[in-house]
Amino acid sequence: MTQKLAILGGDPVRTRPWPEWPHVGPEDVDRLRTVIESRNLGGIPFPNTMHQQFAERFTAKLGAKYGLLATNGTVTLSMALRALGIHAGDEVITTAFTWVGTVAGIVHVNAVPVLADISDDNWCIDPVKVEEAITDRTRAIMVVHLGNQVADMDALLDICRRHNLLLIEDCAHAHFAEWRGRCVGTIGDAGSYSFETSKIMTSGEGGFLVTATEEAFHRAMSLAHVGRKEAPYDRFPGRVFGWNHRATEMQAAVLLGQLDRYDALDKQRTAMAEMLTQGLVEIGGFKPLAEDPRVTRRQRYELLFRFDTEAWDGLHRDKVLEAILAEGVEFEGNTFYPPMHRDELFHITADDWPAIRERYGEKIEPDAFHLPVAERVAFDEAVWIHHSLLSVEPEDVQDMLDAVVKVRDNLGALKKSL
């Protein structure tokens, strides 16, 4: 394939629009119409009718004991921490390679985030670095199951048992992924899921909390319900000062449809991911991450590849992805997740969050951390392929592969243009 690259003025491989996300059907419109015509749109009574339907079904599909739908995935992380007894000044160790919402969930309860580096194998938090980060103020680990990966839960559970720490799972990317046959989110003390607009299941915004502990669940219900302590969700001591994080009936109505079509879309994504992965391996230059056999079901919110700069004649990832994008195919790099401590959104000051002062002073500065793997992966190696590019047909996957081949076949021209 020697056609002129689109980035140099040629015609792109792909000009047709990609399938739209999210998938919406007439049954979704009917369900929303039912809500609107009922005039019962909000979060009261709590939990409301469709809220309760979705919560029961989603919790059961996960194999969890208790589950709560809330306004978004960041607040369900905060609710999990507070419901489990995390207080101001407690340190929570989390990954350096994540969205800012993970850290916000910690900071918003006035706890202290501690970033640990990632494993080079799966780009999730490195258990060795977690153990090195533990102090006498550490109370919890917040693990993120990233992209299409699952963190090493065996090692993290062992650390938590030996050090008497809580384990909270951020499953924003990992709805129904499994570790040794158990859904992630149900393995630690609590799990949190996101239904933000880009996620595999979406209601525009939304979050979900699961736990196996009745007391923590009831406390979380109170936290979401402005601190009300009402039967039958009142089996916890004392009171909490809550928020209003009640999900609306409209969010729940949309999510019921998302859940109905989940398995069919997952089957399609899996087949297209396998086709795309095989094709990229044959082309060269994009290496899939190793697959841990303990991950018994893998999700594909983002398909992750390691960019091999040598295979691209020394060109940096970002220049290659720019050329592929010009061909009509969006593979993302550093624009998806920079390392957390280098993210412009990572702006945490003691004026706003005084609990950080003892460890960090007046502001958490980027140089408070040494995170070489996260920096290398984020700035040079990580390639992210969004699940919307997997909810497609084989001819669409072929367009992706053709775009990559075209750029590979025209590397010389691309290098000369720099």
Curated annotation (Swiss-Prot):
One of its GO terms (molecular function) is pyridoxal phosphate binding. InterPro entries: DegT/StrS_aminotransferase (IPR000653), PyrdxlP-dep_Trfase (IPR015424), PyrdxlP-dep_Trfase_major (IPR015421), PyrdxlP-dep_Trfase_small (IPR015422). CDD domains: AHBA_syn (cd00616). Its cofactor is pyridoxal 5'-phosphate. Pathway: Metabolic intermediate biosynthesis; 2-deoxystreptamine biosynthesis; 2-deoxystreptamine from D-glucose 6-phosphate: step 4/4; Antibiotic biosynthesis; gentamicin biosynthesis. Its EC number is 2.6.1.101. GO terms for biological process: antibiotic biosynthetic process; polysaccharide biosynthetic process. The keyword Transferase applies. Belongs to the DegT/DnrJ/EryC1 family. L-glutamine:2-deoxy-scyllo-inosose/scyllo-inosose aminotransferase subfamily. PANTHER family: DTDP-4-AMINO-4,6-DIDEOXYGALACTOSE TRANSAMINASE, TRANSAMINASE. This is Putative L-glutamine:3-amino-2,3-dideoxy-scyllo-inosose aminotransferase. It comes from Micromonospora echinospora (Micromonospora purpurea). The gene is gtmD.
